[in-house]
Amino acid sequence: MHLVVTSPPYWNLKRYNETPDQLGHIQDYESFLRELEKVWKHVYRVLVPGGRLVCVVGDVCVARRDFGRHLVFPLHADICVICRRIGFDNLNPIIWHKIANASYEVANGSKFLGKPYEPNAIIKNDMEFILMQRKPGGYRKPSDAQRDASRISKEDFDHWFQQIWNIPGASTKQHPAPFPLELATRLVRMFSFVDDTVLDPFCGSGTTMIAAFRTGRNSIGIEIDPEYCQMSARYLKAENSSLFSNAKLLLEKVDTAEAHLVQEDQVIYEARPAKKKLE
């Protein structure tokens, strides 16, 4: 893998479907982090030297009614610590200021903020972190053709390679924690080259994979929830029919109990506009 762009569950902050082994249903925060660490270890294993893990995540704010006091679990910081322990190099993050949708992040924004217009209220939670983790071992050496096909305009470069982004949050009607296609597209273009392979181990509704498709990258998505797998498959098939007549879509179901792959038309495991396959 040349690049990983993903957004893991925000612990149990959001309501995910009842799916076996769903990380978002783990009640103990430390147990959740241990399970998440297993994913990052596999990500580190499959990344090429110099490849990046880009992780979109927000801290977990809990209300007084849940813990007896207002509390923030610093998920972004804990992920950085875990990744450094695995062997990643921590790089500067991007701060994503979510122009809309922020009240959803605290489950009930109006009650979480405390008494209005009085001192000691709780700071509004309207930002997320785009964490940058790099696997050591060298720098990419793409071909001249890849470089030319992957160039970013000066205007976009100056705008994207800043530490604060102002992008509206995506609708939560279809998925409880989506991120905008614009955000995924920027990240794919910033940290990969045309014909590279991009992985999303928490692919949800397939936003990262669509961004990869539209920018000429291969993509692999993994999702545990059958409903979101079907959603991804529909979106990717639509992209394939409208944009990439020569693309190859591989739709597979992974039977974890039997540890083998089962073909199933309605479940998405891998999609790619070119020729590469996950080893």
Q: Which residues does each predicted region cover?
A:
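S-adenosyl-L-methionine
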Residues: 233-274
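Core catalytic lobe of class I
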Residues: 1-231, 264-279
